[in-house]
């Protein structure tokens, strides 16, 4: 009996040591829901070494809450790094070389490897030297198609980049989900070329996916005032921007139900980091379009990278409603800051209906 009691006591101690207790725990509003986690632009976490652990905390938290939140996928709005190919940092707009930045963001996503399918898109800072001077991108070096075994069951199409090589710059992922049927998430490159838009259009029009609910993820689409970009001033060419993405891809496609982007933002109140609009597609259905990019929330462009803010997208059992909540694992881990872990205003917590 003494041996059994001692063994039980050791098990209890080990369990308590391994199960970290946090002041704030995120929960679904319905036990029959599932969720996706939306990570905003990582670049300002990644460009400074002292900020990098915050982004890794966000991905670690996501992995640890896989069961609790019934997480099915993780989305990231792009700008994985601040400079794609810059060997000498200026110590103003970052103190990390491009190699160090790519290594850091890769290390953060290792927290999700072989646990969850994560879907990233490329931003303007992921191309060229500093910001889309050309189409050169290091994504495929650090995020090859074979990297995460959770992609094996869901990665269904990989488009070609500007060099004609298949990479995750343009990729599609199929998720079979209770109450929601088949969802196709398409990640579209920054300022997509005609070929990239046509690849996505052919995919959504195909017999195989015409009855799927399609979620489009792309880096740049609209600004912080929810104005869809007509054009942007980057050197990369050829390129298309928000208005063309809408007119040639989203508007005529009855199965594209929602668009998510990042990129935009300004220093100031939190409403400068987010925007939202609804427009009708060619079939007369409402299409929610959501921009989320919290990177200046933690002290501006040279602050801590965004205070750890992410969004929990709860897909309700009715098969059409998504509850959006804005949460910071960074604030949630300490009793000192736990009261700030949720943002509760109308721009931070709302519902989207997919028609």
Question: Where are these predicted regions, by residue range?
Answer:
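Active-site neighborhood of phospho(di)ester-bond hydrolases with catalytic His/Asp-centered motifs
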Residues: 38-40, 72-79, 117-123, 188, ...
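Bacterial Sec-dependent N-terminal signal peptides
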Residues: 1-22
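A short C-terminal boundary segment appended to hydrolase-like catalytic domains
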Residues: 30, 303-355
């Amino acid at each position: 009996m003494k041996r059994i009691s001692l063994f039980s006591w050791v098990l209890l101690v080990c369990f308590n040591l391994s199960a970290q207790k946090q002041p704030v725990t995120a929960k679904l509003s319905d036990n029959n829901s599932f969720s996706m986690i939306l990570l905003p632009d990582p670049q300002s976490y990644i460009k400074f070494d002292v900020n990098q652990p915050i982004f890794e905390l966000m991905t670690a938290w996501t992995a640890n809450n896989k069961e609790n939140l019934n997480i099915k996928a993780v989305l990231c709005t792009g700008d994985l790094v601040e400079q794609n190919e810059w060997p000498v940092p200026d110590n103003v707009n970052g103190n990390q070389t491009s190699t160090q930045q790519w290594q850091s963001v890769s290390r953060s996503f290792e927290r999700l490897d072989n646990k969850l399918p994560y879907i990233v898109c490329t931003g303007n800072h992921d191309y060229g030297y500093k910001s889309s001077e050309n189409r050169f991108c290091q994504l495929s070096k650090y995020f090859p198609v074979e990297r995460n075994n959770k992609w094996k069951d869901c990665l269904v199409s990989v488009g070609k980049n500007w060099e004609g090589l298949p990479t995750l710059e343009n990729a599609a992922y199929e998720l079979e989900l209770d109450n929601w049927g088949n969802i196709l998430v398409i990640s579209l490159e920054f300022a997509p070329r005609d070929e990239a838009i046509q690849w996505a259009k052919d995919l959504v029009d195909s017999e195989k996916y015409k009855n799927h609910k399609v979620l489009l993820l792309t880096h740049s689409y609209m600004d912080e005032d929810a104005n869809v970009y007509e054009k942007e001033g980057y050197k990369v060419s050829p390129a298309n921007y928000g208005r063309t993405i809408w007119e040639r891809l989203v508007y005529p496609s009855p199965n594209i139900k929602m668009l998510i982007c990042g990129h935009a933002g300004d220093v100031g109140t939190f409403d400068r980091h987010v925007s939202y609009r609804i427009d009708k597609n060619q079939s007369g259905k409402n299409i929610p379009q959501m921009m989320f990019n919290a990177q200046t929330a933690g002290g501006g462009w040279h602050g801590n990278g965004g205070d750890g803010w992410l969004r929990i997208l709860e897909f309700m059992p009715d098969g059409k409603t998504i509850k959006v909540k804005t949460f910071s694992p960074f604030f949630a881990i300490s009793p000192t800051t736990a009261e700030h872990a949720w943002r509760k205003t109308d721009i931070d917590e709302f519902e989207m209906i997919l028609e």
